[in-house]
Regions:
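Solvent-exposed, polar/charged alpha-helical surfaces in well-ordered, non-transmembrane soluble domains
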Residues: 126-129, 133, 159, 194
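Charged, often glycine-rich, active-site loop that binds/positions anionic groups
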Residues: 155-170
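Catalytic cores and adjacent binding grooves of peptidoglycan-active enzymes
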Residues: 167-240
Length: 240
C-alpha cells in the first residue's frame, strides 16, 4: 500500500519514523500513544493512495477560491444539510464565549475547535447528508444530528496544526478535499456512539469510504468509485 502512495514506500516510511521521533504524549490529542500514531498514519495512507493524482489545496486562498467547493453556510440557511458543524471563533472574545458555553451546556455541542473553512466538495456534502439521514433514523430518541468536526484544509493550515503539536500529516485527504472528521465521543452521552460507529463501518465494508478511528472523532475519506454516484445525488438533492 505504501508503495502506491505519492511518497512511495521509502518516503512514507521515513515520514512515519519522523512522526514517531517528534511524538509527545498529550491527553488532549487524539493520538494517545505511539501504537495509535502508527495505526492512524498507516490507515490514513489509504486516502492518499486512492487520490494520489488529485492536486492538493496548498494555501488558504486556494480553498477560499476553489470552484470545486461549495459554501456550507449557504446550504445550511436553506435547510439543505443533514449534519451540523461550527466555525472556529476568530477572536479572543469568541473563544472565551465558546469555552464558557462548553462548561455550562456540554450537551449543546462537542468539545471541538470547529471548521476553519466552511466549504466542502459537493460529493462530500452528499455523503455526509446521507450518513446524517441514516444516523437520525437509527439513533436513540433525543440524540442530536451528525456532527462534522473537520472538512477541507489547506496544506498551509496543516503546517499550522503541526506547529501546535497535532498529528497533521502531509499529504492528507483533508488537503485534497476528500476527507472529513465526524464527532464520536460526544454521542456517548446520548447512547448513540455505537449506532454511528456501526453505520460508518458498514459503509467501509461496502467500499464507499475509508474509516479511521481517531478516538474522539473518526476520519472518513470517500472512495474514488463513489464519486460519480454522490455527485449525481448532490445534483438531484440541490436541484442543480
Amino acid at each position: 500500500m505504501l508503495d502506491a502512495t505519492p511518497q512511495g514506500l521509502v518516503g512514507a516510511r521515513e515520514t512515519l519514523l519522523l512522526e514517531m521521533a517528534r511524538y509527545q504524549p498529550d491527553e488532549r490529542r487524539p493520538v494517545s500513544d505511539l501504537t495509535a500514531l502508527v495505526r492512524i498514519y498507516l490507515l490514513s495512507r489509504i486516502d492518499v493512495m486512492w487520490w494520489r493524482d488529485a492536486p492538493a489545496y496548498r494555501t488558504d486562498e486556494q480553498v477560499g477560491g476553489s470552484a470545486d467547493l461549495v459554501d456550507l453556510e449557504w446550504l445550511r440557511r436553506r435547510d439543505l444539510l443533514r449534519f451540523r458543524y461550527q466555525e472556529q471563533p476568530t477572536t479572543l472574545l469568541g473563544r472565551g464565549a465558546r469555552a464558557l458555553r462548553r462548561r455550562v451546556r456540554p450537551s449543546v455541542a462537542p468539545h471541538t475547535s470547529g471548521l476553519l473553512f466552511r466549504r466542502a466538495r459537493r460529493e462530500m456534502v452528499a455523503l455526509l447528508n446521507d450518513v446524517g439521514r441514516e444516523f437520525t433514523a437509527h439513533a436513540p430518541p433525543g440524540a442530536p444530528p451528525l456532527w462534522v468536526t473537520s472538512l477541507v484544509r489547506s496544506a498551509e493550515h496543516q503546517h499550522r496544526l503541526r506547529q501546535l503539536g497535532y498529528a497533521a500529516w502531509l499529504p492528507s485527504g483533508h488537503c485534497l478535499g476528500w476527507a472529513a472528521d465526524v464527532e464520536m465521543a460526544w454521542f456517548d452521552r446520548f447512547g448513540a456512539r455505537d449506532t454511528l460507529a456501526e453505520l460508518l463501518l458498514a459503509r467501509q465494508r461496502a467500499g464507499e469510504v475509508n474509516v479511521v478511528d481517531e478516538g474522539q472523532a473518526w476520519h472518513l475519506c470517500l472512495a474514488p468509485e463513489s464519486r460519480g454516484r454522490l455527485r449525481r445525488v448532490y445534483e438531484a438533492e440541490m436541484a442543480v
